[in-house]
Curated annotation (Swiss-Prot):
Catalyzes the ATP-dependent phosphorylation of N-acetyl-L-glutamate. This is Acetylglutamate kinase. SUPFAM superfamilies: Carbamate kinase-like. The gene is argB. Belongs to the acetylglutamate kinase family. ArgB subfamily. InterPro entries: AceGlu_kinase-like_sf (IPR036393), AcgluKinase_fam (IPR004662), ArgB (IPR037528), Asp/Glu/Uridylate_kinase (IPR001048), Glu/AcGlu_kinase (IPR001057), NAGK-C (IPR041727). It comes from the Bacteria. One of its GO terms (cellular component) is cytoplasm. It catalyses: N-acetyl-L-glutamate + ATP = N-acetyl-L-glutamyl 5-phosphate + ADP. It holds the Pfam family AA_kinase.
Amino acid sequence: MTAATHTKAQVLAAALPWLKQLHGKIVVVKYGGNAMTDDTLKAAFAADMVFLRNCGVHPVVVHGGGPQISAMLKRLGIPGDFRGGFRVTTPEVLDVARMVLFGQVGRELVGLINAHGPYAVGITGEDAHLFTAVRRDVMVDGVATDIGLVGDVEHVNTEAVRDLIAAGRIPVVSTIAPDANGVVHNINADTAAAALAAALSAEKLLMLTDIEGLYTDWPDRNSLVSQINTADLTELLPTLEAGMVPKIEACLRAVTEGVPSAHVIDGRVEHCVLVELFTDEGTGTKVVNP
């Protein structure tokens, strides 16, 4: 046996405690950032989801599509804007977001996963009443600001997702959803992932980002934290960069509503999901209750 083979065996053996802990459990993964634009990282992420499924873990993927939406808006000559970390969504922007999220980003990820077998099924928040949206404002410099057809999750109906899990499938969720009156809204994927994780009683929520984890004093690289509780994180929230706010709010929401832990992980690391779930080191910041 070669040294490399022995090392592989040790890695697999070391993963056993985590495999036992997660067997039969649901893990919600928010897929976004560089992991969804780099071909190598995209393929690695898809393989990670199939690995989890074949180890008896139930992955549920919720994906964003910000860069792809921005690219299509530019291509179509439609202006786009962000406020408070959220995209301002006019009816024209919503049409593009709806098309790109389900018709492009979701289709690509489903295809990558299904290259390994008949696993992934794409759905949106509109399907089987998965999400009911409620229009939301965001705080910009302390002022409540309207950002158009952007919703929060008012209600989650998990039946369709649970049916897919029971059938051995990997749900791939696009975050477009109607409100109670049928008006369709764009829901931030971080927000939707947290709501779905809580409703499914998931064991973990993983948030892929383009940084190593949570910095308490950005840009000081020494301020990276490996674990933080919800009380400390709530105090820290007003000081964070706008782009991190939806992700941290999502972690707080998930853990507060019963998910044992939420993890902000570095999606630029190949196989980051497996590293976070099945090794001592992990790749980012773990959020837990005090």
